[in-house]
Amino acid sequence: MDSNTVSSFQDILLRMSKMQLGSSSEDLNGMITQFESLKLYRDSLGEAVMRMGDLHSLQNRNGKWREQLGQKFEEIRWLIEEVRHRLKITENSFEQITFMQALQLLFEVEQEIRTFSFQLI
């Protein structure tokens, strides 16, 4: 993962953790957890691609990796919709900027995971 993506994840997670969204803070914590999970999954796919011969290892270690890949894309789509919803309802400029950057990052990560998965197939 390039250093810009790493710092983007860290920055967004830090800023999201500082937000107070009232009764929806549980939802925000869930989003933060999913962002962290997505980052770890993206990192592991990237490492597998860098080793290129790791496809067999990946398949042996987890025969359901394609199913997991599909689940990750569903999570990304859910996060995109959730971030879009938050963006529509917030009037706080700090939150708007954070959610816009989170949305941009989700699109970038979705594309990177797609690219990695095609290289592994």
Swiss-Prot record:
GO terms for cellular component: host cell nucleus; virion component. It is found in: Virion; Host nucleus. GO terms for biological process: exit of virus from host cell nucleus through nuclear pore. A motif (Nuclear export signal) lies at residues 12-21, 85-94. Its main location: virion. Transmembrane segments: none annotated. The keyword Transport applies. The keyword Iron-sulfur does not apply. Keywords: Host nucleus, Host-virus interaction, Transport, Virion. Mediates the nuclear export of encapsidated genomic RNAs (ribonucleoproteins, RNPs). Acts as an adapter between viral RNPs complexes and the nuclear export machinery of the cell. Possesses no intrinsic RNA-binding activity, but includes a C-terminal M1-binding domain. This domain is believed to allow recognition of RNPs bound to the protein M1. Belongs to the influenza viruses NEP family. Interacts with protein M1. May interact with host nucleoporin RAB/HRB and exportin XPO1/CRM1. This is Nuclear export protein. It comes from Influenza A virus (strain A/Korea/426/1968 H2N2).
